[in-house]
Amino acid sequence: MYPFSFQNPTRIEFGLDKEKEMGKYMHEYGAKKVLIIYGSERVKQSGLFEDVAKNLREHGIENIECGGVKSNPTISKVREAVAMAKAFGADSVLSIGGGSCLDSAKAIAAGACYNGDTWDFFKGTPVQKALMIFDAVSYTHLTLPT
């Protein structure tokens, strides 16, 4: 497949090595301090994490990390990341991984702008404000039978 860009209003960048341009994209949206969420250490072992973090630094974006997001993420991990985001003064959350990382990023982004317990959102409290959310690399793959 050929590289392409799509925006409606969500921007999608697709193509080889696009993860190495995350700093550029996030800088365009005004990100300055980002909490990076990821699942397993494979993200680091593959070099993907460092590629993304390096590009963020090259664009003047500070970052901290919270790894270990599991499938069917726990509220305790979300609360941990919310506390980190608040202490750091994050203005955005960057998800590297699959659906569980992205789901966690959404809860963290809302929780970081809320004075109560993030669990309140799951009980029906409406979200009034949230940090910016970026999904760097989706690890959700599709396998077709041959």
Identify the meaning behind each predicted range.
Residues 47-118:
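N-terminal small/polar loop signature for handling phosphorylated ligands or for N-terminal nucleophile
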Residues 30-32, 88-92, 104, 128-134:
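Short coil/turn connectors at secondary-structure junctions
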Residues 9-17, 110-120:
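Short coil-to-helix leader/linker segments, especially the first N-terminal amphipathic alpha-helix
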Residues 1-61, 65-66:
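An N-terminal, well-structured beta->alpha segment
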Residues 114-139:
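Short, acidic/small-residue loops that bind anionic groups at enzyme active sites
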Residues 21-24, 79-81, 120-125:
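A generic local structural motif
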Residues 140-146:
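Conserved small/polar residues in nucleotide/adenosyl-binding loops
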